[in-house]
Amino acid sequence: MLIFERTLHDEVTGAAIASIEHHTLCRADGGFAGTAATPPQRSSAPARPPVENTQDEPPDHVVDIVSLPQAALIYRLSADRNPLHVDPDVARAAGFPRPLLHGLCTYGIACRAIVQACAANDATRLRSLSVRFSAPVYPGETLRTEILHDEADRPGTQALRFRCIVQERGTVVISNGRATLGEPE
């Protein structure tokens, strides 16, 4: 697991305006805990609790958004050159039936659904957003975002829980989603 944290600052004032925390699970990487003579040992640390992929209550809001079939190509124009998103042979070699939609695009679709359903299309109200990607999304699929109101963390904020399901496959692709909305700016 690699964890990166980055803080974005206003160019003029220097004030922090956003903090980004990115977790990457490096599948099939590792083997650094030993030498060829002494194979690596598994960690004795307890396993993390299982991730909950269901929501017991019916959602307060449901938003369906269709991803564009050409979305992966648009993201490639943004300097993401990972061939997994555009090359069918690379996708198959990695165990996927076809190229994947970028995680950032999936994340953006979930964000859009929350802002549309709960913030009257005012993106300045979004204070935080976190997700767990639980399955791949393919370009052209429909993402259904199911949103539940939660207890507010602080006065003046609105806490939300959500998940995203690909309608065509009935697969949960974002689980354990959390968002916080604030007052309009």
Region locations from a protein language model:
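Residues that form or immediately flank small-molecule/cofactor binding pockets and catalytic motifs
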Residues: R27, A79, P136
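Hydrophobic beta-strand-centered segment that forms part of the acyl-chain substrate-binding groove
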Residues: P97, T106-R144
